[in-house]
Amino acid sequence: MWGGREGAEYDSSKDLNAAFNRYREGLDTVAGYIKSRGYNLRIGLEPKPNEPRGDIFLPTVGHALALIAQLDNGDVVGLNPETGHEQMAGLNYTHALAQALNAGKLFHIDLNGQSGIKYDQDKAFGHGDLASAFFTVDLLENGFPGGGPRYEGPRHFDYKPSRTEGMEGVWESARANMDMYLRLAEKAREFRADPITQELMEEASVYELAQPTLDPGETIDDFLADRSAYEDFDADAKGAREYHYVELYHHAMRHLIG
């Protein structure tokens, strides 16, 4: 469900509080109807920052997640993020997918190519920000490094063939989407399986981040009593350590272009 009509060109033209209330009620009504009839359907909202409206409501994944959290029937409402739509707002598409996964709301995806903050280009997947496309595929195919929810849905491409293409070119551009995805998937699997990658992720504390703040059964009082967390914490030693972020990223790029 793409709310491309819902928005404004002029801030004076809408009671924004009322607009969000009606938007929420409309979604809840449709979601409630689906559930009341026992239909095996879910609603996937597709955020977009602008075009055709000057400012579209729910412009990003984060905005949509906030509204979904207010719904009475939000269990059947999730997200269908599009690569270009997040990148039109200057945002990281892979992060958007990750947050939707983390919230249990990644129902579908629309993959395509976008070259920066401009109109919605809908180019073939990977024909925009190639590095971002690589990490998107890495997440979709390999999951989070420390484990967690996985996307099990279709790999869907929402792109437009160039207006300069004839019928043969239209089909070639369709194949380009799938070819790019499969090539990136192979490279992403090789990247994750590489022992150097795993060593660098360890040094970068990627795996450590997967550890919860409190251990199983640990209480806030236990945490406060742990002197290693504050009183005996060696800030100088922590500050002097190397994280190898650039080396890890460069290693990913070697896999991508090697």
What is the predicted function of each stretch?
Residues 1-78, 208-213, 234-236, 241-251, ...:
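Active-site acidic/histidine proton-transfer and metal-coordination neighborhood
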Residues 11-20, 54-65, 75-78, 85-152, ...:
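Gly/Pro-rich active-site loop or hairpin
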Residues 165-258:
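C-terminal extensions of enzymes
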Residues 1, 45, 81-83, 111, ...:
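Conserved beta-strand positions
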Residues 46, 155-159, 194-200:
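Acidic carboxylate-rich catalytic motifs and surrounding loops in phosphoryl-/glycosyl-chemistry enzymes
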